[in-house]
């Protein structure tokens, strides 16, 4: 609940930030509240289906849109090494996104990575 509260608080002063507090695995459920042709989509979920969620939510991005996807390997596969999980997630994203940057989050979140990607 803290993360959702913090996101809502930040969005109050940013009129172009639209927080979605919903099950990201089901974009059809919140499609009516999301603008089309977004320039950016930021995904920060803890789910084994992070790559599939990013692919499903691509529908909201403009053709030149960008996505920032926070990858949490232990949420995807607690038995695999983080590097293996990162590689697997990136492979799943390649049909939908071109990865332009990888940013380690180790200074604040061990074994987390942010992937910056543009729509293919």
Model feature map: region roles:
Residues 3-13, 55-119:
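C-terminal substrate-binding/active-site "lid" region of AdoMet-derived donor-dependent transferases
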């Amino acid at each position: 609940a803290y993360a959702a509260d913090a996101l809502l608080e930040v969005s109050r002063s940013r009129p172009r930030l639209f927080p979605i507090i919903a099950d990201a695995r089901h974009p059809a459920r919140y499609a009516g509240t999301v603008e089309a042709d977004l320039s950016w989509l930021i995904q920060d979920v803890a789910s084994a289906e992070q790559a599939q969620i990013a692919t499903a939510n691509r529908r909201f991005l403009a053709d030149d849109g960008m996505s920032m996807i926070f990858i949490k390997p232990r949420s995807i596969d607690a038995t695999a090494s983080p590097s293996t999980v990162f590689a697997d997630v990136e492979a799943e994203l390649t049909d939908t996104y071109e990865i332009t940057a990888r940013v380690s989050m180790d200074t604040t979140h061990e074994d987390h990575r942010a992937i910056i990607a543009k729509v293919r």
